[in-house]
Amino acid sequence: MDFSIKGCDWSKGEAKGFLTGKSDCIVLGIFEAQTLSGAALDIDTATKGLISRVVKAGDMDGKRGKTLFLPEVSGIGASRVLLVGLGKQDAFNQKAYNDAVTAAWRALLATKVVQVTFTLAQLPVDERGSDWGVRAAILALRNETYRFTQMKSKPEPVSHTLKRVVFSVEPADEKAAKVAVKQAVALANGMDLTRDLGNLPGNVCTPTYLANTAKQLAKDWGMKAEVLGLKQIQALKMGSFLSVARASVEPPQFIVLHYQGAAAKAAPIVLVGKGITFDTGGISLKPGEGMDEMKYDMCGAGSVLGTIRAVAEMGLKLNVVGIIPTCENMPGGNATKPGDVVTSMKGLTIEVLNTDAEGRLILCDALTYAERFKPAAVIDIATLTGACIIALGHHNSGLFSKDDALAGELLDASREANDPAWRLPLDDEYQDQLKSNFADLANIGGRPAGSVTAACFLSRFTENYPWAHLDIAGTAWKSGAAKGATGRPVPLLAQFLIDRAGQ
């Protein structure tokens, strides 16, 4: 799909090109109380009051998400007009904007339009420029057009005909909007990769499949990929990681993906993704109902690969290292048992009280491995705890960090990217719940504050660099009729890296 930018100040009568230019449809916003947006006012004048008459007649009341097509409109170059309800003007925020653009795309994709002129990006949203509106609109469109068909014997053909979108933006935002287009397309491509990996079944997306995906990314984008096998993992003494992998016939893989966009000596940002390609719970077996969704337990790994793909396409001027410990968590005759004690790469011994708390066991060795890169910061991403879903639901990812500056950067990025996160506590008092009579620490801390104690466990392995943890158990995928991976938190991570790169 082709996206282009055209500057236009509707309030100064600069709309002639939009009024006369050929297009299948022009998209206009209407607020409640019969208030026309700036672009709608100009179109109303050009069509001799048509928009006003439609609104006055009650055919378009401006309620958020409502849409109305006006066919065969005379006086303008577009063959039809799509009116989109924006809701109340004094309550128009990021969510209202996203609701409006999503409604617009759904209406357009159900038609045979090929080229669209899109004016909604110029609407004022929380003091953001129209470049932000362009990026959000493209991501919303790509979300609506995403389909996972790889496992279908006869995939349904693409039904929409939309091929080109022209965004009208404020003239002062034109340059930034062109950058936003590039970033949005790269980001959407990264999210699509993350979603594809998550949606693949566990018998296809194995640890080896993830490793091969990383190798292909490196080949496609001029990066370096290292994949460590069982013997190399054993040589590194990653006993905690190996304790999870031992009962599966699928060999574990330890993936390291290097993106170099800055000088080789520049300290990298390290992203560590949990890569459990299927999680039965091990000997602490999960209930059968809903276990199919445990193919999504590698979405942390998928988000690392998707983020680095987006970073490479954007050409960000910084260094990023992706680390992915990946394996299956299976029961078996040689599986780790509750009560077993294992030794981590760091040398700390861990009493495994519950084999279904396995994500932290593979991540702790990866976090220790990350030290060798002398990182500027390390962020781990994991579908780690059901407790995080209880605490935050499916809207916010859980953010944990003792570094206020790093946490602040990530929260700012989450707001800018419309990929929300919420900071949860990481007080030392919670560490007491991880005490063990038989090892240096236990892998679970009981029912209270389960997501917090999981983060506390990881913090024991991150003392030598700035670190943050994102628990995406509630946000990495959706259940029910809309079941599927979401691609989150790729937008948050990519925005954080864009900000760090100063781009």
UniProtKB/Swiss-Prot annotation:
Cofactor(s) the protein needs: Mn(2+)
- So what EC number does this one have? 3.4.11.1, 3.4.11.10
Details of cofactor binding: Binds 2 manganese ions per subunit.
- Residue numbers annotated as active site: 286, 360
Q: Which GO terms describe its biological process?
A: proteolysis
What is catalysed by this protein? Answer: Release of an N-terminal amino acid, Xaa-|-Yaa-, in which Xaa is preferably Leu, but may be other amino acids including Pro although not Arg or Lys, and Yaa may be Pro. Amino acid amides and methyl esters are also readily hydrolyzed, but rates on arylamides are exceedingly low; Release of an N-terminal amino acid, preferentially leucine, but not glutamic or aspartic acids
The family annotation for this protein states: Belongs to the peptidase M17 family.
What role does this protein play?
Presumably involved in the processing and regular turnover of intracellular proteins. Catalyzes the removal of unsubstituted N-terminal amino acids from various peptides.
UniProt-recorded name of the protein? Probable cytosol aminopeptidase
Instruction: Please tell me the species this chain comes from.
Output: Burkholderia multivorans (strain ATCC 17616 / 249)
Gene designation per UniProt: pepA
